[in-house]
Design a protein with these regions (language model features):
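Alpha-helical transmembrane segments of multi-pass membrane transport proteins
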Residues: 1-165
Length: 165
């Protein structure tokens, strides 16, 4: 119970201190290309995913990172013509959400935590964890390429949402 109270206090304090707003202001004031900042954020997720559970990582970071990415794009109500990433605010939210979920999936097979690999090794006692990590290497590479494509060509992600309207 004291641990839960401590965590609640930290989150309440961070919310009252406007941590997402401060982080967004800091990110947008950097003298870097917005796409480079996005890549740094995704690399940060990859590093965090090596040591944290994916859901915990998302719950702790998204309230701070999402407003920063939206600010980089030009805001929630920006039109596609004025946006940094070339898409309107709602489309950018969909794109970033899919990128983050894909990063969470990527982190589930990333050593040393790689939760999915440990689950497979636990279900199949005849296979060692090292063999499982060797076996997921092609998937690790494919996920990296997929994330790269989703960053480079956001139209892949937004094809169906644009058809709907």
């Amino acid at each position: 119970m004291p641990g839960g109270l401590a965590v609640s206090t930290v989150f309440a304090t961070a919310g009252f201190a406007d941590l997402p707003g401060v982080f967004s202001d800091w990110i947008t004031s950097l003298d870097m290309a917005p796409m480079l900042i996005l890549i740094c954020i995704l690399l940060g997720y990859a590093v965090l995913g090596m040591f944290m559970d994916a859901i915990g990582m998302l719950l702790l970071t998204l309230p701070v990172v999402y407003p920063a990415v939206m600010a980089l794009n030009g805001g929630e109500a920006v039109s596609a013509a004025e946006a940094t990433f070339g898409m309107s605010g709602p489309m950018c939210a969909i794109w970033f959400g899919i990128l983050v979920v894909k990063m969470a999936e990527f982190c589930l097979i990333t050593p040393p935590i790689g939760l999915n690999c440990f689950v497979v090794a636990g279900v199949r006692p005849d296979i060692s964890v090292q063999d499982v990590f060797k076996g997921v290497t092609p998937f690790f590479i494919a996920d990296g390429v997929t994330i790269g494509l989703l960053v480079a060509f956001p139209g892949i992600v937004l094809f169906l949402p644009r058809l709907v309207g």
